[in-house]
Regions:
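Active-site nucleophile/metal-coordination loop of metallo-enzymes that catalyze phosphate/sulfate
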Residues: 1-109, 115-127
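Short, Lys/Arg-enriched charge-dense amphipathic segments
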Residues: 48-50, 109-119, 132-143, 174
Length: 174
């Protein structure tokens, strides 16, 4: 894109983009009115939450925990005990794929679909007709209370969905 003849960013150049080391493909601007520089990650963690913290000036000495093999039994046991519901999945998954693969069983059994991703996140998917959104939010609050210390994930996310198999759809109620 940057080598295209149609790439024209006069305002960004005026702010200093063309003066950053490595941006020699841009025409230099004479009257720079902004501050500029090249940044490098400093935090140990590399997920979305840590990145946002770092943009705000907080450098994290420790990475947030991730769960490439799913969450530990003790976490899920406590979650099930406090919510009164068993869980399905417990592994890294795409949000659309997880409801495709586990949605019918969730609707049939009422078990919550718990999954993660490459980031430090605990996600709970549930059909809105089986688990109303407010109840799903309560389950997220319970998960957040459990997920502290060693298992203090960056985010706990509600992932409500609607519809019928095989056409489940995630909603914006999250």
């Amino acid at each position: 894109i940057t080598h295209s003849k149609e790439y024209d960013t006069p305002n960004m150049r005026k702010l200093g983009l063309s003066c950053i080391d490595g941006a020699d493909y841009l025409e230099k601007s004479d009257n720079i009115v902004g501050s500029y520089g090249r940044m490098q990650e400093a935090s140990k963690g590399k997920d979305t939450t840590i990145g946002h913290w770092e943009i705000a000036g907080i450098v994290s000495e420790n990475a947030l925990p991730t769960y490439p093999n799913g969450f530990p039994k003790e976490v899920l046991d406590e979650f099930s005990k406090r919510t009164g519901r068993e869980v399905l999945c417990n592994k890294p998954y795409s949000g659309t794929d997880v409801i495709r693969d586990y949605g019918e069983e969730h609707v049939r059994t009422g078990k919550l679909i718990v999954y993660t991703s490459a980031d430090s996140v605990f996600q709970i998917a549930a059909h809105e007709d089986i688990v109303p959104v407010e109840e799903l939010y309560k389950y997220c609050e319970i998960a957040r209370e459990i997920l502290v210390g060693e298992h203090g994930v960056g985010r706990v996310i509600a992932r409500p969905f609607v519809g019928e198999a095989p056409n489940f759809q995630r909603t914006t109620n999250r």
